[in-house]
Amino acid sequence: MKVLWLVSITIPAAADACGLQAKEIGGGWLSGALGGMTAAPDAPAITVASVDARAETLTVCSKNGVSFALVPTGSVENFSALLKKIAPDLVHIWGTEYAAARTIQQAAQAAGIPVLVGIQGVMVDCALHLNDGVPARLLHSCAAQHLIDRHVPGGLLDVNQARFDTLAQSEAAVLANARHVTGRTSFDRSAVQKLAPQASYYLCNETLRPEFYTPPVWHPRTFGEAPVLLLSQGNYPLKNLHTVLKALPAVLAQYPGAVLRVAGWPPLDKGPLLRPV
């Protein structure tokens, strides 16, 4: 069986196989899932596909028994050419939160290839609650901020809101045309029932990053010790760093040694224009 697995980023293994520099910090769970699948004795033949503008044309590379495909844009034409070249038995769309999900779905359906859609985040709800708790005065950017953002892309809230709204519409189209959908949570299932009532739903829990399965072994903290709070991302308001900061004084009042660690996009790496932000 041959599976074409569309993911939202070019994972490090794909960049390495195709002679590109790995540019993504995230996506460790994708690499972990790929390693787990390829290690299985009955693993299908997998081609991991992504949209990457650094690939001027359709590019297919192989390394360690895995194929990787890069398309320069997520157009129906590019994905149609990819499907013709790979001839997969199944297309697995990992996530509905990016525009390429819809176009590869269209290309696969036109070619008569079954499609499995995996929910990674329900964009319609993310868009609805993206800026919850953010003061209204911060939700609109001025012309100067938009000018700077064009040259030094940052995280303007109104720009992000427009992007999330667009992706929510694209996701709705994907799910409206889906016949098979996997999800992890009751929230996912509820969303699929509303957005894809015609689809068969499958519960599919996922792997964690490899670090969770290798030494040193992690153990829950001893009750009463000062906690270490981890926020997986703080670079956009959906993750609610602003809410955590409001609650932090109450936490510190009870646990003076508590520590908050924030992962994700570091503004200091974005150059001097964004450092004062």
Where are these regions (language model features)?
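N-terminal subdomain of nucleotide-sugar transferases
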Residues: 1-69, 113, 251
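Short N-terminal targeting/anchoring amphipathic segment
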Residues: 82-98, 104, 114-116
